Amino acid sequence: MSQRKPWEIIIRPIITEKSNRLMEDYNKYTFEVALDASKPEIKYAVEKLFNVKVKKVNTMIVKPKKKRVWNKFRQYGTTKKWKKAIVTLEKGHKIDILEFAQK
């Protein structure tokens, strides 16, 4: 495991309709994480930051999307690729995600 701090691994929580439904129904929380973070690093970071017990971590890399840049040449650019982690917690553990998002 690397010597990075937990807040260097977890970038921000992702709060969407789908992630809220996962939170309420399945106790799964969604985070944007560092692109080179591994599953054990993500598990360690979530457990240290929120004092909870992690059951499982699923990760995926979100592909870059093509975007138009409106200048006089109408060029195309892309967004950056990023990594998303869906963290499943043990029963009885909860995270106050809105409190973390405000920090």
From Swiss-Prot:
Signal peptide per UniProt: none
Coiled coil location: none
GO molecular function: rRNA binding; structural constituent of ribosome
Statement: the UniProt record of this protein carries the keyword Ribonucleoprotein: yes
Subunit annotation: Part of the 50S ribosomal subunit. Contacts protein L29, and trigger factor when it is bound to the ribosome.
Function: One of the early assembly proteins it binds 23S rRNA. One of the proteins that surrounds the polypeptide exit tunnel on the outside of the ribosome. Forms the main docking site for trigger factor binding to the ribosome.
Family membership noted in the UniProt record: Belongs to the universal ribosomal protein uL23 family.
Protein name in UniProt: Large ribosomal subunit protein uL23
Highest classification ranks of the organism: Bacteria, Pseudomonadati, Aquificota, Aquificia, Aquificales
